[in-house]
Amino acid sequence: MTIDDRKIKILQAIINDYIHTGDPVGSRTIAKKYNLGVGSATIRNEMADLEDMGYLEQPHASSGRVPSNKGYRLYVDSLMENQLLTPEENLKIKQYIIDTAMLEVDKIVRQTSSLLSELTNLTCVIQTPSVNKSFIKSLQLMKVDSTTLVSVIITDAGVMKNHIIRVNSTPTIEELNKINAVINRRLVNLCIEQINLQVINQLKEDLQGYDELFNALLTPLYETLKNAADSPDLIMEGATNIFNYPEYNDIEKAKEMLSLLNDKESLRDLLKTNKDITIRIGEENYKPQAKECSIIAAEYSFGNRPIGTIGLIGPKRIDYSKVISIMAEIVKELNNILNNQSK
């Protein structure tokens, strides 16, 4: 049996209705709400065929139909219509661009997670850049006044750390240029996890005569190493959002979801993607705890190098069109912000 145009229109109407109501859909509902040009009896027969073909399911003998995983997949791949963002959503994204333009990467990522969770009402999980695996791209000391310097440490993943350094007397600009050259010869292209006591002692020898400055420099170096060790691998916002959906009134489904949200290893696996946007529905998620949800994932980049992934987790009946439009726009702006910082 092939799926003809009429069946496709009926399936599309059923999925749209179920996404927005959460109630199993009957033939009368489709006949009343959607102008398909056929009566409820014809729609009922077509729905039976769609169920036989695996696109619909009937949760209870006396209830209407709901989309199956196969039905959702056809909808996402072929039937879903693009949805424009609302003026309010556009305004919030513009404000996000302004607010994050000059922030450090980890703070940008946190704000991105918060905004995505707010606009989609889903749980957002972001895999952060692995700081301890990053390489130092630059470490610069800049003079503020006669007793104050600022150190700026930048990694190849775009993570930037600023620290204020207080000394009795700052070096001259000429001396500072030489000191920066020495520091960068020693540290640039070193992986952060490679900066050990031996490297620190070598740097101390290189900076003989600038003991006060070297000792002051140890603090930002230590903070960078500590942050690398403590840096969270995953950031989660809106963890409770998913429980606003009635699907998770079922205690067993709620337990499965809680188990998933607390399983970082599984979340990292489920976020893997090498595409702009990946949509996995139900059992496509290949983790038992995720078989009743959908996960939408996308990469984000710094300097055109992928450095992390973003995931949205929700029930299978999420508003795919709306969520994908929001995610695509925010990921695009996140990449623009990070790539501008890399220049």
From Swiss-Prot:
Keyword Transcription regulation listed: yes
Which is one GO molecular function term here?
DNA binding
Q: Which cysteines are joined by disulfide bonds?
A: none
- Name the Gene Ontology biological process terms: negative regulation of DNA-templated transcription
| Keyword Lipid biosynthesis among UniProt keywords | no
Q: Which UniProt keywords apply?
A: Repressor, Stress response, Transcription, Transcription regulation
Q: What does this protein do?
A: Negative regulator of class I heat shock genes (grpE-dnaK-dnaJ and groELS operons). Prevents heat-shock induction of these operons.
- What family is this? Belongs to the HrcA family.
Record protein name field? Heat-inducible transcription repressor HrcA
Its source organism is Clostridium botulinum (strain Eklund 17B / Type B)
The organism's taxonomy opens as: Bacteria, Bacillati, Bacillota, Clostridia, Eubacteriales
